Amino acid sequence: MQYPEPIAQLIDGYMKLPGIGQKSATRLAFFTIDMAEDDVTAFSKALIAAKRDLHFCSICGNITEGDPCSICADKTRDQTHVLVVEQPKDIMVMEKMKEYHGLYHVLHGVMSPIEGKGPEDLNIASLINRLQQNPNIKEVIIATNATPEGEATAMYLSRLIKPAGIKVTRLAHGLSVGSDIEYADEMTLFKAVEGRTEM
Amino acid sequence: MQYPEPIAQLIDGYMKLPGIGQKSATRLAFFTIDMAEDDVTAFSKALIAAKRDLHFCSICGNITEGDPCSICADKTRDQTHVLVVEQPKDIMVMEKMKEYHGLYHVLHGVMSPIEGKGPEDLNIASLINRLQQNPNIKEVIIATNATPEGEATAMYLSRLIKPAGIKVTRLAHGLSVGSDIEYADEMTLFKAVEGRTEM
């Protein structure tokens, strides 16, 4: 016996999401059938709306409804700093911190030889272009993830930007605040020692 | 900074699903934005369709597009056995086994004093009614889960149905096929010894 067509379709839909296999998708599909109709309708509309109404900011690559995005359009922000991140969601994380008031640039990925992703597949050309056209940008802070790909991308960007006389910095590596040295991995510990600061 | 409204709405939508919190929902929402438009549209429509086109079978309580469901409507199936399950998805599991050819009845839950769920909240009245109107039903196989609530519900049903002279059976408990005795819990092992069969 097959699942009724509407369930089978819904299971297929859920299975398109990352980390959701046949079993989870089936569970979610049956849960959906028990959900309030309003919630399902709202969810369904939100899916379409997110796809239809959101675009990438033509300046920084952030996800936005308008263009440019609210950060690029905000002239009260520090126009001398550009923080480079891998994904739009990283901007949200930085903004939650409330301590950075400069601009952003989203690469939409990192260089990854394994996935065949080179610099030309990333939002790098527009960053270089942006730096050339805005001489008031004094520092580029690279905030790619602390993965091998993130490090390689940071290194590549640094070599590309430094010759133009712009300061390039990288987020510090070290122990998480509140964490035990005992549980830190060797690489993090090494970075923490290497980057030790005077008290 | 807040997420753009369409993303916030989509995150809300995902958070309505079981086991998906703020972080997972955010990840899924951003993933959705990168999905192919066709896939998102299909998913969105499937949500609405599943809610709109599916109903419970008026006879057995299974989820179905038509009424009665394809199993109740299939007169070639063994009309003398009714297998009682907690949820519609349990029917799919049984059907995959391909060894049971009788009918089903879905309780839509189990008795649970903690959740304040009594017999009157389950699809039990219609089961009794069905047994009374179909004298050709000779055996009711109770296949609720092997949880305390499932056991209690099985016991309750057994006491309710037996006096009518209908045979009531329960799925066997025991070791999983291919499993090691070493890893079986005491309760399962006890049930396996208790239910031992002659060779």
From Swiss-Prot, chains A, B:
<dbReference type="InterPro" id="IPR015967">
    <property type="entry name" value="Rcmb_RecR_Znf"/>
</dbReference>
<dbReference type="Pfam" id="PF21176">
    <property type="entry name" value="RecR_HhH"/>
</dbReference>
<keyword id="KW-0862">Zinc</keyword>
<feature type="zinc finger region" description="C4-type">
    <location>
        <begin position="57"/>
        <end position="72"/>
    </location>
</feature>
<dbReference type="InterPro" id="IPR006171">
    <property type="entry name" value="TOPRIM_dom"/>
</dbReference>
<dbReference type="GO" id="GO:0008270">
    <property type="term" value="F:zinc ion binding"/>
</dbReference>
<dbReference type="Pfam" id="PF21175">
    <property type="entry name" value="RecR_C"/>
</dbReference>
<comment type="similarity">
    <text>Belongs to the RecR family.</text>
</comment>
<dbReference type="Pfam" id="PF02132">
    <property type="entry name" value="RecR_ZnF"/>
</dbReference>
<dbReference type="InterPro" id="IPR023627">
    <property type="entry name" value="Rcmb_RecR"/>
</dbReference>
<keyword id="KW-0234">DNA repair</keyword>
<keyword id="KW-0479">Metal-binding</keyword>
<keyword id="KW-0863">Zinc-finger</keyword>
<dbReference type="GO" id="GO:0006310">
    <property type="term" value="P:DNA recombination"/>
</dbReference>
<comment type="function">
    <text>May play a role in DNA repair. It seems to be involved in an RecBC-independent recombinational process of DNA repair. It may act with RecF and RecO.</text>
</comment>
<keyword id="KW-0233">DNA recombination</keyword>
<dbReference type="InterPro" id="IPR034137">
    <property type="entry name" value="TOPRIM_RecR"/>
</dbReference>
<protein>
    <recommendedName>
        <fullName>Recombination protein RecR</fullName>
    </recommendedName>
</protein>
<dbReference type="GO" id="GO:0006281">
    <property type="term" value="P:DNA repair"/>
</dbReference>
<dbReference type="Pfam" id="PF13662">
    <property type="entry name" value="Toprim_4"/>
</dbReference>
<dbReference type="InterPro" id="IPR000093">
    <property type="entry name" value="DNA_Rcmb_RecR"/>
</dbReference>
<dbReference type="GO" id="GO:0003677">
    <property type="term" value="F:DNA binding"/>
</dbReference>
<feature type="domain" description="Toprim">
    <location>
        <begin position="80"/>
        <end position="176"/>
    </location>
</feature>
<keyword id="KW-0227">DNA damage</keyword>
